[in-house]
């Protein structure tokens, strides 16, 4: 069964090889004949490609080596945020990353929790996208620097503190946990809006903090302090 799945994925990789080369030729030709302005292409239509291969490390590495020769604007690792175990995702990143161009964007698709992001950065990833901060917020799950809280829980009914005392977002500066919980319990749409605003602010601040820690050479300590804490439910 393993061999059969591997063989099928191998055929997918071969097909993607041909598509990668064709798409690159089409994009370059569009610039050459003036259909697309070169400056616009570079600024707004940057080409990224994705290293495929399911959970087969050898296929992912093989495909990454192939697309690395295409000199694209960035390279993505995808297909690891749709139910795969976290340990498998980290292993695939670790296997593929050494073969990704050092001077190009490294993009992990569809990831993830704050802990996932910190672990992926530790493995060389630059860029992420995910619905998690907004989707979780709409269900009352809010990120803080001490972990994740469920604002619907009864213990927040009379809690006058902000969602996160360490957060400087407009929501934390203006509203209490008790009020936001009330909005959720009353099914007021404002509750979800405030929750989404907070979580998006938190994620943006997390990325800023990661960049600062990398610049300061203190990212390893930051990783050790927060990689598990931020995903803990409190």
What residue spans do the PLM features occupy?
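Secreted/extracellular small peptides and ectodomain modules produced from precursors
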Residues: 19, 128, 167-170
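Residue-level detector of alpha-helical segments with a strong bias toward transmembrane helices
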Residues: 35, 88, 227-228
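Glycine-rich phosphate/ribose-binding loops and adjacent secondary-structure elements
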Residues: 49-163
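C-terminal extensions of enzymes
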Residues: 164-234
């Amino acid at each position: 069964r393993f061999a059969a799945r591997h063989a099928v994925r191998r055929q997918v990789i071969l097909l993607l090889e041909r598509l990668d080369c064709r798409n690159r030729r089409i994009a370059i030709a569009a610039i050459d004949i003036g259909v697309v302005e070169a400056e616009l292409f570079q600024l707004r239509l940057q080409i990224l490609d994705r290293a495929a291969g399911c959970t087969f490390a050898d296929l992912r590495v093989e495909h990454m080596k192939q697309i690395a020769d295409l000199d694209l604007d960035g390279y993505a690792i995808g297909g690891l945020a749709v139910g795969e175990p976290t340990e498998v995702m980290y292993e695939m990143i670790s296997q593929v990353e050494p073969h990704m161009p050092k001077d190009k964007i490294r993009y992990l698709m569809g990831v993830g929790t704050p802990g996932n992001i910190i672990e992926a950065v530790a493995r060389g990833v630059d860029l992420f996208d995910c619905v998690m901060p907004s989707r979780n917020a709409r269900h009352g799950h809010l990120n803080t620097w001490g972990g994740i809280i469920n604002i619907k829980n009864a213990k927040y009914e009379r809690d006058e503190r902000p969602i996160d005392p360490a957060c400087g977002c407009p929501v934390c500066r203006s509203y209490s946990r008790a009020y936001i919980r009330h909005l959720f319990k009353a099914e007021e749409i404002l509750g979800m809006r405030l929750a989404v605003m907070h979580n998006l602010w938190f994620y943006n601040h997390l990325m800023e903090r990661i960049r600062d820690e990398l610049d300061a050479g203190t990212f390893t300590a930051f990783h050790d302090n927060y990689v598990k804490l931020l995903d803990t439910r409190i």
